[in-house]
Amino acid sequence: MKRGFAINREIKIVLVGPPSSGKTTIKKVFFEMANPLKLLEHPLKPTKGFSSSIYSFFNWKIGIFDLAGQENNFWFNKEIDIFNNSNMIICVLDIFNKISSLKKFIYEVLDIISSLNLKNCKFYIFLHKIDLVNQSYSKSLLKYLEKSLEKKIKINQNIKIFKTSIAEEYFFHSFKIIYKILTVICNDNLIQMKETELKNLEIELSIILRCKYEIKYYNQDVANYFKINANELKSHLRRLETLKFIESLVFEPFAFHLTNRANWFKIGLKSEMEKIAKDKFKLGIEIMHAFLNLNEVYGII
């Protein structure tokens, strides 16, 4: 996919931010279903230049350009054209950075949006790694930035700020943010699904909710519990493997266990206190439905 494109049903997203802010990690965890715990324990090496990846998402193609933070002066000046035709710019900021640095970076990106006349480009700011600070600080920082950008936001409704993290206590929250961003930018009613797909997802989410983390489950026992045959269960487990929610056991191919992704997803879903149980179940189904339809087509490093 070219650097600049504006063809119908093609979406261009640019990830930008200071060095080591977590841009690539977010892409890996939510777009490529990487293990968040592994990436927390073994952080990725810094991106050099830029990496581009293309994903299919229902009837859309999403191109993501991940820009190396060490080369921001280059992107903001000589190579500013890499932002051309962007449908969305996601600015990932390490919440530990100085507030003055955060503001400066945000305004630099806003200047690019203005200079390239990206009127319809959505600008989403991620205050990332919020698990490493107390909640009162993250809330006060969010309010401060919203107040600082108040005039800009009134003029441009496409500007939004989110608090994100790939850590356990915020994993589902961030998953939900990415889900909402995808559904908004594609401007489609992606929630609608066939009755058969809804039933499949109900079983698959029920498997996640019923199973306990780090416990071994035999396929036949699970099939008996849900009153489905072995082939039907195999299909459900294959889909859950696509989401990296389960892993088959190497020496016991007819058994599986939940991954930490599934466990963190389940913990977050259950903690959605503002919704009644039925709505929580529906939200889980909608998110799984969306991400089962997100697939990497190819990537260029």
Residue ranges of model-derived segments:
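Conserved G1/Walker A P-loop phosphate-binding module
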Residues: 1-42, 60
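Switch II (G3) loop of P-loop NTPases
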Residues: 59-76
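Short, amphipathic alpha-helical interaction segments positioned at domain boundaries
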Residues: 260-298
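Short amphipathic alpha-helical interface segments
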Residues: 193-225, 284-298
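Canonical P-loop GTPase G-domain recognition
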Residues: 133-194
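Inter-motif core of Ras-like GTPase G domains
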Residues: 74-98, 112-115
